[in-house]
Amino acid sequence: MSEKSNMSRRSFLKATGGAASASVIAGTAAGQETTTQQGGGGGGSGGTLNLINTGTMSTLDPIKATDTASGRVIQQMFDALMNYPDGAIEVQTQLATGYERSDDFTTYTFNLKEGAPFHGDFGEVTAQDFIYSWERLAASDNSRRAYFILDSIGIQHETDSEGNYKPGTLAVEAVDDYTLRVTLEEPFHATLPILAYTSFAALPEGILGDIQGYDGEMEYQTFATQNPIGAGPFQFETWQSNDEAEVSRFPNYHGETAQVEAVNWRIIEDDNAIYTYAMNRNADYFPIPTPFYDPNKVSVENTDDKGRETGTYGPVRNGATVNYLGVATINAFYIGFNTNRVEKPARQAAAYAMNQQQVIEQIFKGRGQAAYHFTPPNIYPGGPDAYTQHAEQNYPYGYNQTQIQQARQVMEDAGYGPNNQYEFTFTIYSGSDTWNQTAQLLRDQLASAHISMNIESAPFSTLLQRGREGNLQAYSLGWVMDWPAPDNFLQLLNPPQTDTSQDAPISYVNWSGTPAANRAASAYEQIEDNPAPTDEAEAARNESYVQMEEANWEDVVFLPVYHETDERFWYQNVDISKFGAAGPSRQMYNTTSIN
């Protein structure tokens, strides 16, 4: 759900007079542990795995997709050097067979699989294909993830006088056809995990002409909507906007050939339609929307060493008892406030009124954890216990409380009252009954604090577009990890990246010009200045992460609401692996079978 800018963030800060950097940063070095994914075998059981995609898709281009709905499909068609197997957070090699890392953590040399074919007649994957694909990520006007390669991982490159990336200068070298050497500006604690993200996937060199030096072998819109070419276990079949998408088994896949013949996603955003589709057995593996979910029907039979719960659920409406999986994935769902359009007292009043625990229990039926930080508990500095302790002791708007009197007082102090009410609009994404209920509860509470809050809904893709254009006041969104460390989340609260007047901001809050915003910007610079996978750098990062959380508390830019427990249900004919903390959107289906 983030966006890109082709301007280096460091250069942007210099150009705009950003806060001076200090010395602090961190991350989860454990996230760089890897294993090797074995290829060969597979294929056979056939049939179509029928799924539900609960959001509108926007594109099939890996560097342009910023929404989970598109990402679910892209994950099946495009392979990268690394991968999160079944959404676990220990990365594996994928198109790489192994790698070497320099002692100073700045040079990575990857050995590629030989003979790994692209779909169609585009030959095998080579190092030159990765150079081309990563140049697109950095330089293409279609890229919304340029900051991943230019800033987050920080591959060496040159910039022009305005701080923009100078095309063709990435320090990515093809030593030979099957050896790729990558040089970073400085060490980064999550290099291997970020390379598992599909924005770094391989495309055939020259397939598109959206960067310098290439005319392209097909039109961009054809690739992005009708004929995406990758090296994944499935190849594209169809995508009908707001209807369905389908991929089919790629028989020459370099890894384990898919068991199923095809995977089909019906695109449905409405909760009632989702549940009806699943109850009619049109979906094999599916979510159950909260309005139709009964926690008393869950029977947990096993909890593994990663805390994943498995068992059964039912009976459901059609009389069946289905399989159950519940995983505390790494995510955060929140209300974002455009600070240019919603005054601070109103934002604070919303925080006073919001009782996150009440929302989880009464609206979400216990399917998650109340959120008081944007950083999820399982990657918060010090872990879940530290998360809870910091929130209990320091959250300024009432931990597990609704404080209407304080909400009313902050608005009266700002000059509002019964005859002078403040008004703003909260936009939620269409089809979400739970967000609609949350919005209604907040609206009713704020009515007692001299605030008239309007509620509107918009399709997910429309909400994102309006956000990028700065045309939202308050909005509901969520963020699911790209790599398992706090900086992947807190980049959304880095003030320079929230400016909607810039090219594709990462969030839509326009946070600047306040003491808290300045502290957050300074803290994020400290994070950037301490990127190494060392204990010292991690301690520095951890300090800055907490500073950013507290700065957000002060200005209420994001109002955290909940951390979701991802649950999936499936009929007895499906044999599917458990997904991990990276979530089901990172799971590949080539090992899934239909009986």
Can you say where each PLM-predicted feature lies in the sequence?
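Extracytoplasmic/peripheral linker and loop segments enriched in polar/acidic and small residues
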Residues: 12-13, 100-101, 170-173, 398-400, ...
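Ligand/substrate-recognition segments at binding pockets and active sites
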Residues: 17, 241, 398-404, 408-482, ...
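N-terminal lobe/hinge region of extracytoplasmic solute-binding protein
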Residues: 52-101, 229-230
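Gly/Pro-rich hinge or "lid" segments in bacterial periplasmic/extracellular proteins
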Residues: 85-86, 187-188, 195-264, 272-273
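Surface-exposed binding/hinge segments that line
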Residues: 129, 147-211
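Ligand-site clamp/hinge motif
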Residues: 222, 246-309, 452
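Append "and occasionally in soluble cytosolic enzymes with long acidic Gly/Pro-rich linkers
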Residues: 343-444, 547, 593-594
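Long beta-strand-rich cores associated with HINT superfamily self-processing modules
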Residues: 447, 568-595
